[in-house]
Amino acid sequence: MSKNQLPSYQVVADEMKMATLAVTPAELHGLLAGLISGGLSQQDQSWQPMLFDYTNDGMGWPSAALEQAQALFNVTSAQLTSDEMVLNLLLPNAEGEEAIFALADALSDWVNHYISGLGLAGAAFNKASEEAKEALADLEEMARLGVDEDDDLQEQAELLEQVIEHVKACTLLIHAEFGAKTSSSETPTIH
């Protein structure tokens, strides 16, 4: 897995299942992204006890699952702090008619856990800009969206892709306001 590439959804799902952790990859990624967007830096390891409390009644995770979470944290932090403004969400990549329902459910889980992560990190939305408040309101609305099985599934799939892109934009906007800034040591020195 490269520095900015997420692991596959199924790999993370299998690891969580083996560790008997009741958290989906989408929930885990959303929570970590929310913690990072809420102000935790990549060097801040306080996310681990928060993760344990939130997902496992305060009990630590098995080392393989924690390594998977650490890698996911690192990739997510790298994406959110990159100048490229690209964020990938860890969502299922299934095929077939039922895939759209699984994707919509996973997106809702991602967004709900992202919002929880913002809260756990202590993001002060009462002092936020209007844009950040609007982005949070949009996320709260998108967390309640679903797919209507009676509607045209192709049209629903296209709309869901637009919603996913809007979730990414809202996440990047919120991170730009609340997220930890990258250290200036990465800036080249001029002699």
UniProtKB/Swiss-Prot annotation:
Any Pfam family hit: UPF0149
SUPFAM superfamilies according to UniProt: YgfB-like
One term under GO cellular component: cytosol
InterPro entries documented for this protein: YgfB-like (IPR011978), YgfB-like_sf (IPR036255)
Family: Belongs to the UPF0149 family.
PANTHER family documented for this protein: UPF0149 PROTEIN YGFB (PTHR37528:SF1)
Protein name: UPF0149 protein VV1_1551
Native source species: Vibrio vulnificus (strain CMCP6)
